[in-house]
C-alpha cells in the first residue's frame, strides 16, 4: 500500500469514528488489540530484511554441540588483555577482577543484542521502574538490546522506519543531536507546540486531524518523537495525565512513539518515599497497543564516555532494530559491556538506588546555585523556568530576537558559549532568543564569570543595537549533547 493510500485510509477511519479523548479515564478507554503487523511502519530497506537461515546462523556459532569454522573470528592467542581489574564507587576498597573466561568472552565477537548478563540486569531495571511483565509472557513478549549510546539507537531507528521524504512529529524544541541522524536522511519535521507540561494534546490532535489541509506536501507521519522527563532543552517534566492523553492520540492516529528518556533518573522534585524519589511512569509503562520504542542511556547519570544505552520494545519490533544494529556495528563494545555489568551486579539494586539518589542531590544543589547566579547577574535580562528534571535551564534573553547572532557576534569573543536555541529547533529559518544552560556541569566559580560576562555583553549588545560583522563564516551549531 502506498503512503498516500495509508493517509487517506486513516482519514476515512477517523471520519467514521467518534473518539472522545477526554471523556474517559485512561483505564476506561477502549484500546485496540496490540499491533500484529508493523510492515506499514518499516522503511523500504526493512520491507524485505535479510533473513539468515538456521544453517547460515550456525556458521557463526560455536558451542559444546557445534564445532564452527565458518566465522571470521581471530584466535584467542591474539588477545592483548590478560588481566583487568576495576575499583568501583560505593564498593569501598573492594576490587573486581575479570576472569580468563570473561576476558576471552569480551575480546571476541558476541551476540548483537549484547551480553546476556547485562541485558538481564537492564531488563530488571525496566521491570522494577516501568512495571513490565516477564519478557516471555505469552502475548506480551518484549526484549531489549544494548547500543553504544542513544545516538546510535536513533540512527538504527531512522534506518528501520524512515524513507526519504517521510515525516516525524517532534516537540517545538527538541534534542539537537536527533537532527544529525534525521536530516541527512531527508526526513521532514512537523513540530507540535508545548506548554509547561510538554507537548499539548489539543495541538497534536489538531495537527493530525487537519494534516492534508495544513501539510499538503508532506506525508502523513508514522511516528512521534518525545523526551518526557527533563525535556531537552526545556527541562519540562510530562505528568501522567499528559502522557496518557498523548498516548491515546497516538492510538487514534495509528502512530508509534519513540520515547527518548536519558533523564528518567534525573527527576528532582518528586515525592520521597523510603529514602527514594518516586519516579514518574513512562510511556512504556502504559503501552497497551505495542506502540512504544523506549531509549535509555547510562550517559547522563553514570558516564557519558562509556557510550552505553539500551532500546526496549515489543519482540516484533525488537527484531527489526536488532537487524539494523547488526548491520551497522555487529554489537556494542564487549569490554564496555562487561565493565558495566560487573558494576551493576556488584552494586545490586540498593547501591544502584544510592547512586541515583546521589546524582539527584548533586543536581539539586547545582540547580540551586544556578538560580542564585541567574538572579544575581541577570535579573531583568532573562526569563526562565526552573527545570523539574534533567540537566538544563532554558533561558530567554530579553531584548534580542536571535541568540545565535548574539553568541556568534559578541559572546564567543569573550570565551563564553551556551547552547543555541536554534540548535534545538526543527525549523532553522526561525530566529529564537533562547539559550540552553547546562547546570550539571557548572561550577559556581566558573558560573560567576560566565553569567557576569553574559550580562555585560547583553547590555552592550542591546544598547548599541547593532551586529558586529566578522570576516570569517562561523557555524556554532552544537548537536552533540
Swiss-Prot record:
GO terms for cellular component: cytoplasm. GO terms for biological process: alpha-amino acid metabolic process; biosynthetic process. The modification N6-(pyridoxal phosphate)lysine is found at residue 300. It catalyses: an aromatic L-alpha-amino acid + 2-oxoglutarate = an aromatic oxo-acid + L-glutamate. It is an enzyme of class 2 (transferase). Pfam families: Aminotran_1_2. GO terms for molecular function: aromatic-amino-acid transaminase activity; pyridoxal phosphate binding; transaminase activity. It is found in: Cytoplasm. Keywords: Aminotransferase, Cytoplasm, Pyridoxal phosphate, Transferase. Its cofactor is pyridoxal 5'-phosphate. Its EC number is 2.6.1.57. InterPro entries: Aminotransferase_I/II_large, Class-I_PLP-dep_aminotransf, PyrdxlP-dep_Trfase, PyrdxlP-dep_Trfase_major. Its main location: cytoplasm. The keyword Cytoplasm applies. Belongs to the class-I pyridoxal-phosphate-dependent aminotransferase family. Has aromatic amino acid transaminase activity. This is Aromatic amino acid aminotransferase DDB_G0272014. It comes from Dictyostelium discoideum. The lineage of its organism: Eukaryota, Amoebozoa, Evosea, Eumycetozoa, Dictyostelia.
